[in-house]
Amino acid sequence: MVLNSDLTTQDKERIINPIERPTVTQDLSENVILTTVDDLYNWARLSSLWPLLFGTACCFIEFAALIGSRFDFDRFGLIPRSSPRQADLIITAGTITMKMAPQLVRLYEQMPEPKYVIAMGACTITGGMFSVDSPTAVRGVDKLIPVDVYLPGCPPRPEAIIDAIIKLRKKIANDSMQERSLIRQTHRFYSTTHNLKPVAEILTGKYMQSETRFNPPKELTEAIGLPVPPALLTSQTQKEEQKRG
């Protein structure tokens, strides 16, 4: 074995595969990121929330202020979507009525998993000022769909909406892919049966062909002052005789 005496110290430092363990320098630690699949997946989701805006009352006016340059909710990665199939967050802002409840549930079911809900305002959470006397207001949207973050207020300020989004981002950061397959939607909220009365469709597209348009009721024609057709008088007389029986 012949040693090369001309080998300098600089050439020794160029050894590609040294035997000893290399020391981790400060420059190397700043360029290496250690993470898990859950953390990477959650980070990508919380950084690009696409909300579906479901505004039915005055709370939506406060949420509209976030779109402006003063609050600028785009810095959180929020992009408003008009289609539920492209959204992963729905924000219910305003009173939910019995007639609007089936449409809200349908929009929620069309959203892909995982999906989240923010209940914004007192009317959405408990019914608000309509919870006592109104026969059509739903006393809490959590009776229809699961809610992740409750945002009280009448209406909440835009700063409160930002705080709710930050809390939702923290919740998304702690999600686990293994636990997500075991947790069902019914485990996330308290559900009670809501008696919804089925109502016939009003807008059928056949208004011009309706019977009442060609044969208006007798009371209506008398109130307007139109002459009552003989056929209408005969039909009204027959109906009265049938009722008397």
From Swiss-Prot:
GO terms for biological process: aerobic respiration; electron transport coupled proton transport; photosynthesis, light reaction. Its main location: membrane. Its cofactor is [4Fe-4S] cluster. Binds 1 [4Fe-4S] cluster. Keywords: 4Fe-4S, Iron, Iron-sulfur, Membrane, Metal-binding, NAD, NADP, Plastoquinone, Quinone, Thylakoid, Translocase, Transport. Its EC number is 7.1.1.-. The keyword Iron-sulfur applies. It holds the Pfam family Oxidored_q6. It is found in: Cellular thylakoid membrane. [4Fe-4S] cluster binds at C58, C59, C123, C154. GO terms for molecular function: 4 iron, 4 sulfur cluster binding; iron ion binding; NADH dehydrogenase (ubiquinone) activity; quinone binding. GO terms for cellular component: plasma membrane-derived thylakoid membrane; respiratory chain complex I. It catalyses: a plastoquinone + NADH + (n+1) H(+)(in) = a plastoquinol + NAD(+) + n H(+)(out); a plastoquinone + NADPH + (n+1) H(+)(in) = a plastoquinol + NADP(+) + n H(+)(out). It is a peripheral membrane protein. NDH-1 shuttles electrons from an unknown electron donor, via FMN and iron-sulfur (Fe-S) centers, to quinones in the respiratory and/or the photosynthetic chain. The immediate electron acceptor for the enzyme in this species is believed to be plastoquinone. Couples the redox reaction to proton translocation, and thus conserves the redox energy in a proton gradient. Cyanobacterial NDH-1 also plays a role in inorganic carbon-concentration. PANTHER family: NADH DEHYDROGENASE, NADH DEHYDROGENASE [UBIQUINONE] IRON-SULFUR PROTEIN 7, MITOCHONDRIAL. Belongs to the complex I 20 kDa subunit family. NDH-1 can be composed of about 15 different subunits; different subcomplexes with different compositions have been identified which probably have different functions. This is NAD(P)H-quinone oxidoreductase subunit K. The gene is ndhK.
